[in-house]
Amino acid sequence: MEITEVRVFPVNEEKLKAYVTITLDDCFVVRDLKVIHGNTGLFIAMPAKRRKDGTFKDIAHPLNTETRERMERTILAEYDRELRKGAAPRPTGTHDD
């Protein structure tokens, strides 16, 4: 399985930092992953649905640690790129010579 596209949608909330959509093998889309700032740093939360008892159940999730870690690395790298793009816009009229 290859993550062929990652789209990051930053939000300005205390713990929720972004929503993410990924495409797998150019043929399967997973929406509503979240980049969360927790006690030990950033992590990825899988899309989930609230149950009648108030708990949450993942809609989709990796079946093993290796896949979860690969997804997390790929998504957080794209999140960092997106922040750098938005955090340091170049002033109008400047260019590198």
Curated annotation (Swiss-Prot):
Example of a GO biological process term: division septum assembly
Transmembrane among keywords: no
Database matches in InterPro entries: SpoVG (IPR007170), SpoVG_sf (IPR036751)
Family membership noted in the UniProt record: Belongs to the SpoVG family.
Keyword list, A-Z: Cell cycle, Cell division, Septation
Keyword Oxidoreductase: no
SUPFAM superfamilies according to UniProt: SpoVG-like
Record protein name field: Putative septation protein SpoVG
Biological function: Could be involved in septation.
Transmembrane regions: none
Taxonomy, superkingdom: Bacteria
